[in-house]
A protein has these predicted regions:
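Beta-propeller blade termini
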Residues: 1, 43-53, 94-104, 166-174
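Hydrophobic beta-strand segments that make up the repeating blades of beta-propeller
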Residues: 2-7, 59-63, 110-114, 182-186
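Short, solvent-exposed loop/turn segments at conserved positions within beta-propeller repeat blades
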Residues: 12-18, 64-67, 121-122, 126-135, ...
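Blade-edge motifs of beta-propeller repeat domains
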Residues: 19-41, 72-92, 124-164
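Fold-core signature of tandem repeat domains
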Residues: 23, 51, 59-60, 72, ...
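Extracellular beta-rich repeat passengers
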Residues: 167, 200-201
Length: 201
């Protein structure tokens, strides 16, 4: 068993972040560690799946839109990170991700979510007093190569006020029609409230 650790760092200003780390089993109970220090960022979520259909697990790690969301291609057991394999513009405020073939075409898709709003979208606002939900979770459809210039789809707005932080995705065929639904778990976002109130958990 190998381990992959997402580097988050200290969750306070200036949110400097941290680098990711892999612990690769040596087969004798010990591990060799690999630090990806050149890709330090504010990582939150990730997932594993066979993105390129070569029979092994690749990894995605998302950093909330700082330009260093990564795809780690698995090349014979060596993880090679690249920020050029994922559309960074679609990763704005995306803090969680899953890999799942949602359209059943044989290619793994990337489903990402995080903050359902964009920072600073209205410069006349103080805090989040008049921001709106404009940054819904996104599906980037896979092609067996990367997630660049691919078709993508925004998920419908949740309609659940003040629960605009996506914490996880699950997949299940609720109505037995042969098509899998996406289950999204959320938590409170402090939107349109007074500053200084605690986050809902």
């Amino acid at each position: 068993v190998d381990l992959f650790l997402l580097g988050h760092g200290y969750d306070k200003q200036p949110f400097n972040g941290e680098f990711n780390k892999a612990l690769i089993s040596n087969g004798d109970g010990s591990f060799s560690d690999v630090d990806y220090q050149s890709f330090e960022s504010f990582y939150h979520g990730g997932a594993s799946g066979d993105i390129d259909n070569d029979g092994d697990l690749d990894i995605v790690a998302v950093d909330g839109g700082r330009g260093k969301s990564l795809i780690y291609k698995n090349l014979n057991g060596q993880l090679e990170p690249s920020e050029a394999l994922i559309d960074q513009a679609l990763m704005n405020q995306m803090y969680n991700a899953e890999l799942f073939d949602i359209n059943n075409d044989g290619f793994i898709d990337l489903i990402a979510g995080g903050h359902d709003w964009s920072w600073g979208q209205n410069p006349e606002c103080e805090w989040w007093s008049c921001n709106t939900y404009d940054n819904a979770p996104v599906i980037i459809y896979g092609d067996g190569v990367d997630f660049i210039n691919n078709e993508f789809q925004r998920l419908p707005a949740s309609g659940i006020d003040k629960q605009g932080i996506v914490t996880n995705f699950e997949f299940f065929d609720f109505d037995n029609d042969g098509q899998v639904e996406i289950i999204i778990t959320r938590t409170g976002d402090n939107m349109n409230e007074e500053p200084g109130l605690p986050w809902d958990q």
